[in-house]
Amino acid sequence: MRDARNCLDSRPAREINARVISTQPPSNADTDESCNAGTVAGRLEGVRNWLRGLFQSEEVDRDPRLKIICGCLLLYCHMTFYFWWQSPEALSTLGNETFNYAPAGLIQNFRWLAFMDYFQTRTYLYVQGMLALLGLFSLFYLRSSLLALCLLAWLAVNKVFFYLCDFRLFANYHHFHLLYTLVFLISSDKLRFFRCALGLSYIMSALVKLSPSWLFGEYFNSLPDKLPLLPKVNWLVTAACVGVIVLEFIGPLCWLTSIRWLRRLSFGAFVLFHIYSGVIVGFWYTTLMLPLVVAAFLGFDEPLLKGCRIRGRNIVTVGVFGVALMGGVYHFFIPGDARLTSEGRYFGLFMFDATRSVRFEADIQKGNKYWTVQVYRRWQMDDDSGENASAIHCDFYQDGRLANSFAVRQPIRDGDEIIFNPAMFASARMRIYGDPYLYYYYARELVRRYQPDRVAIRLDQRLDGHKETVRLIDIPDFGQLNPAYNPFSRNEWIQLPGDESPPAYRWP
């Protein structure tokens, strides 16, 4: 005991003093600062952990294939916002002011959703594009992919918002991108369920092709060059079209088999298909699909569903698959041919389903003024030239006499009011400019804005090079009829082909 006491007493005084000082209680200021710092840090860490669990970022960190997929989805966000940034008029308040605004049927009564002016919209889209690049950079620079996944989720929400604000932006590759992004973000076991999403999208693409345009080869046989790099023989083109349908139906089923060479054969067939189809459809679809397919099926050594357990959050993913599949077949339950009426087609991954020729006519009368506007999109003229016209023409009458006849290249005005903007129709893609909803929405907005005495609209369409014409809309007085558009069901004011129409127009 004495030796121990002597040892204790022999310690340096400064050590004993330090021990005493360390046992003194901290001041109130020090206590508050440390508590606040701990609380903020704790909350941030809690949010970070919640986001990690939400997006399963550790899974992406471990698998370079998932990083490539995430990078491709971010790159596509950048491409999308860059394309929209180039012409944002219709996404801003300027679109409504200039009569160049056509929201999706789901939000047709929500004009207030476009609340930013032209400059604000353009700047906002630019920022989203830069955020996509930031996410892409962080994905390969930072150890954690959490920032990239959070930015991908933010960009997907913004894309959906602007996408619905102008249905003329609708394209199958944007539908694909949104589905893939949603599945990638919400799933655990991401690689397996992303492969399932690819398989589902191929099957849904095949469902859209169940029409004479593809089953009988009418789509590509109606084109002057038919299919590139193949002989210009009708039966061969038809066989190739049917072969694509078979591949999209059967190919994903091969991923379930334990036969490795069959899985690899299917994988190789899809890669070759996307490389070839890029010659026809261009960069957008190919840039999305080709890298995703290659990245997703690297190291595809086991059947797709081997060891799969559907539980927890993946029940939600399976629910998304179910909703998507229902959307893909929804148009079959609406009477009429979706190639003509477009009813229900946007709930699925709508593809190139037919070539279209469109003629739209609008008669506008107010007081002693009368306009007849004609819109042609790839319309084969009835004269001897046989040319396909894509133009807009107007005849203006005053007091019953023709006062002017001109090609429409600028908005038509009556005083300060715009009654027709050619950009509303010229900016629509091939799969959109045949949609009766586009012309319905124009007439509805014209009646609301201009309050004319009478508006009459007529819409004629031809599919796949057929010379026979189908009249889809014939409304002599739009204001008096006051039709409504329901995106979920049959709209009676859209006429269906009669018995005198060619069989190709009466499908199914």
Regions found by a protein language model. Give the residues of each.
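Intrinsic-disorder-associated, low-complexity terminal segments enriched in Asp/Asn/His/Tyr and depleted
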Residues: 6-9, 30
